[in-house]
């Protein structure tokens, strides 16, 4: 297998957490960092190089220019800016769309032909804007979507059932935001639906829907209130996406994918189960949703699309 090259655009906490996770898993032999502040990119590259001395395999980390992206296999984009005091969400979204469009054009001009993973928020909207501006295929433009929300859900279910999170099949779908929802009708442990598994094993399944909502909907706020930001969890989740693609696992994970008729919608990037393999998103999986879940999915699509269309008018 040829050596893997991964480029990071945006050397903030999330980007650096991803790169550190990827390094320790041995996902690539070469890493490059692009940041609006070249000194910051250099400083992080130096720090990561020092860390690499303790790894059991050789890697290189350096500051990249956009021209260096031509033969990269992956680009992970976390670049964007936070909300300013007094600024509306729409103004922030419009400005971050402008930023991602500029990045997309520079990436395309470099000759890059690999897989782009977008993590910048609001991720569903920014991923769509990047895809539209770059013209890259749906397979090769992947949003982080609700991957972290899903990881939190699986952890909460596993803790309740006293099993490994790897034994839990559960998805948070829709927007990476307030309109996301848990697909309760699809929760399984060891192949058994949650309620059936509960009866088999004697675990308490009363009020489980209400109790599982908390770690999904409030966990990020709990972290932000205590340490101002979340980054290790999403960094590890993105490394997992990259790992599955590199290893061509064909595993099913949640990711932000562009819908082309799946679930009855077109043109919206949203968190859904996908098959990950060497080509990126190899298939979108349409799981069965009950009527309540279908309504929530449609509401989430409508919210994402409206914000995107309104932001475009504001540019």
Swiss-Prot record:
Entry annotation: catalytic residues: 176 (proton acceptor)
Top-level enzyme category: oxidoreductase
An example Gene Ontology molecular-function term: L-lactate dehydrogenase activity
Primary location recorded for the protein, binned into one broad class: cytoplasm
PROSITE patterns xref list: L_LDH
Record has 4Fe-4S as a keyword: no
Localization terms from the record: Cytoplasm
Phosphotyrosine carried by residues: 221
InterPro entries associated with the record: L-lactate/malate_DH, L-lactate_DH, L-lactate_DH_AS, Lactate/malate_DH_C, Lactate/malate_DH_N, Lactate_DH/Glyco_Ohase_4_C, NAD(P)-bd_dom_sf
Entry's Gene Ontology BP terms: glycolytic process; lactate metabolic process
Entry keywords, A to Z: Cytoplasm, NAD, Oxidoreductase, Phosphoprotein
Record EC number: 1.1.1.27
Keyword field contains Membrane: no
Function: Catalyzes the conversion of lactate to pyruvate.
Protein name per UniProt: L-lactate dehydrogenase
Native source organism of the sequence: Mesomycoplasma hyopneumoniae (strain 232) (Mycoplasma hyopneumoniae)
